[in-house]
Amino acid sequence: MGISSIVTKETLKKKETNIEVQENNMNDLVKSASRVIAPLWPIATFAAHHPWMGLEKQSFEQVADWLKEIRNVDIYPSASMIHSAKAKGEIEELFLQSGLSRWLDSQSFHIPREKAERFCQEALKLERLPSSLLSSPELNKLAEEISYINTGGMKDSSLQLISSLIEDQKGENLSDILNYHIIKWCKLYLDDSGASWTMPNREKGLYRAWHHLITFDPALSKNERKVLKDWPQDAQGALTKALSELGISESNKQAYLEGHLLALPGWAGMIRWRSQQSIQEQELMIEYLAVRISMELAIVKPYLPIKNQKIEKKVEVVPLIASWIYWGDISIEEWLQMSATEQSELLAFAYRFDENIRKKLWLEAWEQTHAEQLREKIASKQRATNDKKHVLAQLAFCIDVRSEPFRRHLEKLGPFETFGIAGFFGLPIATSELGSNDSYPSLPVILKPKHQIKELADEKEFKNYKQRKKIDSSVSYTFKTMKQNVLTSMLLPEVSGPLLGLQMVTRSFVPRRVGSFIRNLRKTMLQKPDTTFSLNHVHDTKCEIPIGFTKEEKVNYVRQTLKMVGLTEKFAPLVVMCGHSSQSTNNPYAAALECGACGGAAGGFNARVFATLCNLPEVREALSAEGIKIPEDTIFVAAEHKTTVDELEWIYVPKLSEAAQEAFDRIESVMPNVSQHANRERLTQLPNFKTKIKNPSKEAHRFAEDWSEIRPEWGLARNASFIIGQRELTQDCDLEGRAFLHNYDWKQDESGDILASIIAGPGTVAQWINLQYYASTVAPHYYGSGNKTTQTVTSGLGVMQGNASDLLSGLPWQSVMQSDNETYHSPLRLLIVIQAPTKYIERLLKNDFTFREKVKNGWVRLASVDPEGQWKNW
């Protein structure tokens, strides 16, 4: 499958003499080509994304074949991963055999079925063909003699970048040289870490800034600079001219642009993200490609003309014959006795049953085994939903998989009911913390904030706090200024050495005590005052979005969230909204451990705002008129679940009623035990803890404070399912921290709107998280970010390996691997399980084209559990 077949494009029929039409066509081409890469968020707000989000109109299998062809990237689990999973009992042989039977039934071939099955069974062992066999002179001679056999449609072609076809006199590929230059310019332009000397003319855009400097670049030869001396002033003109001089035809342009974007998907992804953030940079993708392809022309021009592009990929006959000899138990003598037609049939069959098909069957068997094990687990624990015990407190947690063990242990230790909901609690807000002039979106990255909420304090207390904070920040600012200044940077080691040396020693040998001391000291010094929020609507023309909510909006958001989790009656005296956050030291990926539903930030702010709204008399009065009656003695509070240490920190506790105080005290009394159990379960999964842990909570805190710790927690590794239904469906199930859990009561959703919004919002976030972990596991060299210990944080944006690599877009090795040879994360596509009648699922698939496409094309799996408890795979 060719590159351009991935993305549909309109035929270009306009004359080249029409400049305006050329520009419009170029815009369309770049827009279509951009779908082969995913936007990459800065690492400080590490937002989960999956690298194939723009390709979901194609099937997973098609994209896998395409990536294998053009980038040699394999997105199926490796043979070692599959063998390991089978040894652990994660793959049932029965599902593999049924998958093979279905595949054979779908194929047309003219060899005996028994012979084909025997070949496939051996090939499915995923053993490599012996190198001695592949290099056998006898076999290669045989292949030469039968190379005339017509393999029909088995040949394919791919479009190569011209620079990738040429090597310089030193033997270095010109595409590597081109990448080196592009990385340099991207770092200069995108720098977000406040470099003392910024790129000149940066405010005019990437292309113009590059155009102004390129003829002075000493890294280019005199002839290369000469090519670019009188280059067009605008990006579109430059891109058009470069493609023309390279000899790229109209029909190949989009495929050629795609190839350049895939060459450095990290930097290109960051460029794409930036282009979506402001009107001023909306042309950034065109500018990036103009710079890249213009530089390619300058580098390759001495070697032009060259016959490129569509390179016919000849089918290698040797491995196909070798596969029949090794797996099909055919000797060379038997092969020679066959007719040309028989040989051709065997070659065609072996070609079709290639490595991707074999791994696809294994992956599907792995996924089916997981689905069946989950079905059995749920079925064995099903209970009636109408006979609820007395509940003292209700706690709403984020759907994050790390909440599942914590909720399970909490429910065992008291009369508590827990709910699952996206951790932004349905509030589309941008938050501005006390003393900050900036705000950050605290909601899933697929949404845009509609309200700004500011943290407020008493004017006098705020003034004192601001002064203390200024002193605190001035220390960091002074240190940074001295470090970047030519003269003071030489003095800095003498001034800061003793203090930083002491910190290094103490942080290394007593990390838990020192970390706790520093955090408490800073908290004491800052003395943050009690705060409130700007909840009431304020019209401010200086702000892009309104501050606060109208009364109707307050009621609407509370109603919407309560209905989404099915909490509209039988309120407990205490309702706790639990956001979540992580705690780690010296960790560039700290945001990846925070709340994905809050855009890579902690969820406590949203939890506190929502709880405050629920306690407002006017909100309760309006809800009561609609039939949602919250008892007067029911109080909403907010807490933050710290996932690294499995503790609950109270962040908003108003005056409690007597019943609510009793519930609060009960939670406080059981929380140490909950933390102990949850930490023990979690820590035993880490590579360093195979023996019994004496004090799990103490060890968890050490991990959080140790600045040499490369794996403070597993994050969302091993996530595999997203269960949408009532808590009773999974309450007594040990889901091993692998399931996103979202409450849903189909009986309160006659229209299906609630289910649709869960799928469109939290469902999409869960899918992105799942496929990011999947991609980082199966193709770490392309979609992961390598080893944490050798990474370099660059430009305040992300990480690189060394100082001249692609901007690494995925998760580090430590987030998905148990050891060099063993994975921890199981690379399975997300299984979405919905507890609802069949007609609800049918309606969802009928109305939601995007979701239907994801299911049909294999980007997610779908199952349902009807009111009678019957499981159905869709």
Swiss-Prot record:
GO terms for cellular component: plasma membrane. Pfam families: DabA. Keywords: Cell membrane, Membrane, Metal-binding, Transport, Zinc. It is a peripheral membrane protein. Zn(2+) binds at residues 398, 400, 580, 595. InterPro entries: DabA. It is found in: Cell membrane. Its cofactor is Zn(2+). It comes from the Bacteria. GO terms for molecular function: zinc ion binding. Forms a complex with DabB. It comes from Bacillus cereus (strain ATCC 10987 / NRS 248). Belongs to the inorganic carbon transporter (TC 9.A.2) DabA family. This is Probable inorganic carbon transporter subunit DabA. Part of an energy-coupled inorganic carbon pump.
